[in-house]
Amino acid sequence: GVYQHAGPEIGVASTKAFTSQVAILVILAVLLGRQREMSYVTGQRLVKELARIPDLMRRVIAREDEIKSLAKKYQSRGNFFFLGRKYNLPVALEGALKLKEISYIHAEGYGAGELKHGPIAMIDEYMPSVFIAPQDSVYEKMISNIQEVRARRGPVIAIATEGDYDIRAIADDVIYIPKTL
């Protein structure tokens, strides 16, 4: 086994366990990549980026008042969708789980590519969807998914990369996160 170094769990929502598991997977991927074709420079860049995560998390936490305001706006909603693609699918699943664990509000996480295969039928003006939509290789597909939800009058909360002001035109609310690799 691998010791996570997450420390003792104090609450039900074990976000630090999820975060430490992701960090371990990144380190494992770099180790395996270095044994194959990954260059030393690329491996170093990934490890340095991983070391930046605590500071980047502090930047997001500094937006506490903005996020509390959003929580108040949506507190009466009884259901939420969390949607992500590729590497952000586990983040969407974890986000839905955390909302359920902490607030006892029903939430489901889905791969955004599966939206048309059932979940879209649940979208209406009372069903907010949280999109994990950083500017990455599947960004345009996420924008298309957001537009599908908007066409059904569904409220959209986007988790987007700092500096992505275009997403404001199609999302009701945006929480910005720092740009990473």
What is each PLM-predicted segment?
Residues 1-128:
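Active-site phosphate/pyrophosphate-binding segments
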Residues 2-3, 108, 130, 156-159, ...:
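Short hydrophobic alpha-helical runs that function as membrane-insertion/retention elements
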Residues 24, 30-34, 105, 135, ...:
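Short, well-ordered loop/turn and helix-capping segments at boundaries between secondary-structure elements
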Residues 85, 134, 161:
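Cofactor-binding loop segments of dinucleotide-utilizing enzymes, especially the Rossmann-like FAD-
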Residues 114-150, 179-181:
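Glycine-rich, anion-gripping cofactor-binding loops and their flanking helix/strand elements
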Residues 158-166:
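Short, polar loop motifs at secondary-structure junctions
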